[in-house]
């Protein structure tokens, strides 16, 4: 038997093409193996070789899920591989979602062993860990020296049909699959030993972990929108010019509260984005492309809504820990309630930003305030647990399109906001994506 043929999937950054400015690049097969694929090839040793690297921009995949997946599948199929490896994606949200999606598609559609790797908090891990093997990695490429060898070793083992051990033994993220096994000591003895450790306050590991369900009951629909006070929250990092609170561009440790009393339009002279997870140009040109202050102010004057809340809350969601996202929302939700806010419009941009946003959505809705989540990567919002979801235009400009004239763009933004208000007026019992 000859070497196993391997196809490697990576994003534009690891292909050496560029960062966010190249995130919209369509899928293609690299003419030469990029350095990361060359390293993977060496790690696979004499048993396998990387015969092709498929590259796709993170934003392109996220904004064109079906098209991108179908195109990449054809490219993978054309290389006739025996094994498919995606990533590692670490904590890059869009990359993780793309890696998980295409790994599952290759496995299910082509019947080829497929493996990926990413950080446990990557939204792609939550979405695909039950469907495919996802090797647990560090949260950044600084962990490449450990993550890539582990991914290569496990992928080879899987492709050869060898017995796969537990997550703790192999290093993949728990899949929620229970497997019967044999132990030297009978169950009663193990149970007593576990109980004794628990009573002593010592660490112990359960043999039967229970699933954690964290869905939140949808907030009640708004009965009279013309009387409702609407607040804006965003994980898209919109801040006053100069970022006075010094909110980090990634892995935020704080959020900001900003006064928009008397503000009808978020101009480039007064507002910008602190977000480091996408090209900031579009948001810096017009921050209304991320939070629709201009449209909501018009609606307030027209009597469509009762009032736009004086303050909006903002953080940068990319790479931000789930626990931090929860804590942010828990804190400012108390202020929203005290101010008599009736509903919230929450906007997000990139992949981990959407995870952060959806996490905040749930925390706000625990108070009973209904929230609508406007985002581009809707599968992440669904996976995390947002209840009312409205699809956005694009990751760097969820509520705008720079290709349109200012008047056309504002009309497009208004259409999305109108759909969002309709979502808030609609009584739901389960997660709902409000499509056109």
UniProtKB/Swiss-Prot annotation:
GO terms for molecular function: glycine reductase activity. The active site is at 350. GO terms for cellular component: glycine reductase complex. Its EC number is 1.21.4.2. Keywords: Oxidoreductase, Selenocysteine. It catalyses: acetyl phosphate + [thioredoxin]-disulfide + NH4(+) + H2O = [thioredoxin]-dithiol + glycine + phosphate + H(+). The keyword Oxidoreductase applies. The keyword Oxidoreductase applies. It comes from the Bacteria. In the first step of glycine reductase, the substrate is bound to component PB via a Schiff base intermediate. Then the PB-activated substrate is nucleophilically attacked by the selenol anion of component PA to transform it to a carboxymethylated selenoether and the respective amine. By action of component PC, acetyl phosphate is formed, leaving component PA in its oxidized state. Finally component PA becomes reduced by the thioredoxin system to start a new catalytic cycle of reductive deamination. Heterohexamer of two alpha, two beta and two gamma subunits. Component of the glycine reductase complex, together with components A and C. PB is substrate specific. Belongs to the GrdB/GrdF/GrdH family. This is Glycine reductase complex component B subunit gamma. It comes from Peptoclostridium litorale.
């Amino acid at each position: 038997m000859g070497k196993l043929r391997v196809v490697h999937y990576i994003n534009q950054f690891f292909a050496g093409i560029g960062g966010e400015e190249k995130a919209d690049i369509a899928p293609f097969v690299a003419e030469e193996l990029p350095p990361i694929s060359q390293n993977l090839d060496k790690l696979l040793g004499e048993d396998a070789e990387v015969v092709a690297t498929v590259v796709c921009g993170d934003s392109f995949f996220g904004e064109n899920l079906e098209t991108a997946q179908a195109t990449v599948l054809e490219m993978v199929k054309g290389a006739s591989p025996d094994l498919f490896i995606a990533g590692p994606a670490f904590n890059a949200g869009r990359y993780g979602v793309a890696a998980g999606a295409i790994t599952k598609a290759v496995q299910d559609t082509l019947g080829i062993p497929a493996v990926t790797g990413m950080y446990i908090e990557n939204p792609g891990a939550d979405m695909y860990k039950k469907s495919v093997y996802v090797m647990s990695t560090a949260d950044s490429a600084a962990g490449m020296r450990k993550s890539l060898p582990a991914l290569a070793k496990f992928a080879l083992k899987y492709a050869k049909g060898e017995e796969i051990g537990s997550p703790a033994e192999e290093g993949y993220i728990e899949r929620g699959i229970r497997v019967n096994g044999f132990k030297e000591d009978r169950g009663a003895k193990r149970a007593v030993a576990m109980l004794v450790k628990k009573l002593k306050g010592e660490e112990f590991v359960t043999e039967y972990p229970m699933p954690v369900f964290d869905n939140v009951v949808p907030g009640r629909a708004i009965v009279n929108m013309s009387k409702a006070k609407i607040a804006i929250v965003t994980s898209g990092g919109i801040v006053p010019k100069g970022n006075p609170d010094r909110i980090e561009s990634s892995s935020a440790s704080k959020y900001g509260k900003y006064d928009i009393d008397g503000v009808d339009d978020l101009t480039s002279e007064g507002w910008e984005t602190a977000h480091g997870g996408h090209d900031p140009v579009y948001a810096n040109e017009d921050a209304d492309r991320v939070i629709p202050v201009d449209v909501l102010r018009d609606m307030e004057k027209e009597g469509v809504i009762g009032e736009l809340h004086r303050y909006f809350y903002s953080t940068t969601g990319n790479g931000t820990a789930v626990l931090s996202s929860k804590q942010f929302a828990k804190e400012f939700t108390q202020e929203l309630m005290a101010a008599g806010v009736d509903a919230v419009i929450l906007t997000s941009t990139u992949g981990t930003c959407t995870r952060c946003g959806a996490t905040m959505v749930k925390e706000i809705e625990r108070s009973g305030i209904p929230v609508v989540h406007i985002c581009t990567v809707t599968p992440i919002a669904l996976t995390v647990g947002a209840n009312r979801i409205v699809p956005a235009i694009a990751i760097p400009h969820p509520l705008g399109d720079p290709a349109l004239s200012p008047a056309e763009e504002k009309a497009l933004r208004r259409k999305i906001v109108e759909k969002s208000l309709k979502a808030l007026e609609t009584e739901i019992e389960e997660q709902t994506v409000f499509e056109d």
